[in-house]
Amino acid sequence: MTTNTEKYILALDLGTTGNRAILFNSQGASVAQAYKELSQYYPHPGWLEHNAEEIWEDTYAMIKDVFRDTGVSSSNVEAIGLTVQRETCLLWDKTTGKPLHKAIVWQDRRTASLCQELAAKGEAEKIKTRTGLVLDAYFSATKLSWLLDWVKEEKPNLDLKNVLAGTIDTWVLWKLTGGKVHATDHSNASRTMLMNIESLNWDQELLDLFQIPREMMPQIQPSFSIFGKSEPDLLGGSIPIAAVLGDQQAALFAHGCNFPGMSKCTYGTGSFLIANTGNHVTKSQNQLLSTIAWTQLVKGKLQATYALEGAMFTTGACIQWLRDGIKLIDSVAETENLALQVEDTNGVYFVPALSGLGAPHWDMDARGAILGITGGVQRENIIRAVLESIAFQVKEVVDAVNKDSGIPMSHLKVDGGVSQNNFLMQYQANLLGIPVERPAFIDATAQGAAFAAGLTIGLWNNYQKLLSNNKVGQVFEPNKNATKVQESFVVWQKAVSRAKNWIN
């Protein structure tokens, strides 16, 4: 029997609708992967929860599956890169290792009223100045506050000194290291609405505002650093966890967007357009978020790379709703052909505000809507309208980025599961009037985490050489339909105005 001497990097990509483990070889190529769909819990309208135990159990099972399928052991794996859905958070008991409540997901709207109370007290501007974020239920702070109130009421005898808080990266790190490491990185911490974007530390005034004890919060580390090692008994050996990133930041890194002005858009559960703004915070005048792309130690000094982001909450989620909610389709993949069976939407416009509206509207009270229905409208028209709405949202954010930067975007790099829809990508190119570039390997999130971990550990020492292995899969150029598509955008904006402020 021959011994496998190849060296690998393991990427863990823990998303909103599913979790994935991908093994990359020493050339930076994907050689194996495992995937598990994640259960979604909707206890009340506008609420969404995940079972953190399921996330951990799936993570562990996927690692085992990848090792079994490839014959690779922990001794072959140089490092683990971890990337996660952001903002989703939980509390757990460090004594038992059990979550105290299901994790509250980033799409969850239960704390909208708390945000409105804080806005009425004039706290929104302070929060934006300190964190770069708008005051919204999207971020972790109000979710952690709600969870703490629930624990105090439902478990009054629990000693809060035993309670730990964290986003999904923190939870999985804690489990991977056998409870030895309670940490996060700056890219994930910057999405909690509790980290000061200038000092790069927890902001005590904001912790006090949301009544969250600092000792519950994880230590913040550079994104590209050694967070600890996996517990030997778990994986048959200790593997360094050498990078932790938010999912959108990991995708930005995979695309090679390491210079100011470079950007990408991920089409996943939501759509997220991020533009690198360099080593200084750029404040948006157009309702974009100022956030951390990643951090690293350079000659012993902490260096932050900042970004502007437009977060759109509902992309794959509205296609999933077509399948699971109203059962108009049997599979996500068939939406492309169904949309192409009709010339247009027959006057139908869809507003994808199933979890409110994100950038650039930031309307927690908006709700989804289908407008323009007449007797001649068919299933295919509605499906096409849903896909078109995804492109319309992205155009709003691209327009905002262009205004903030003063430099029109020349092309758009894309990734994520929904970017496989050729109809949508062509429609997006027509709408923006610029080429849309999709890589051959679309799991950019996992790839970015792998690249970061391999560079941190020294398996690779040339980022640009790694990127040169990335092949362009397809470029969608604007075609003769561009003018008609852009006219539809104006009508869609009218539909959005009808759906805004719906429940207030």
Curated annotation (Swiss-Prot):
Binding site for sn-glycerol 3-phosphate: T16, R86, E87, Y138, D247
Main enzyme class: transferase
GO CC annotation terms, alphabetical: cytosol
Superkingdom, taxonomy of origin: Bacteria
One Gene Ontology molecular-function label: glycerol kinase activity
SUPFAM superfamilies assigned: Actin-like ATPase domain (SSF53067)
Annotated protein name in UniProt: Glycerol kinase
Organism: Trichodesmium erythraeum (strain IMS101)
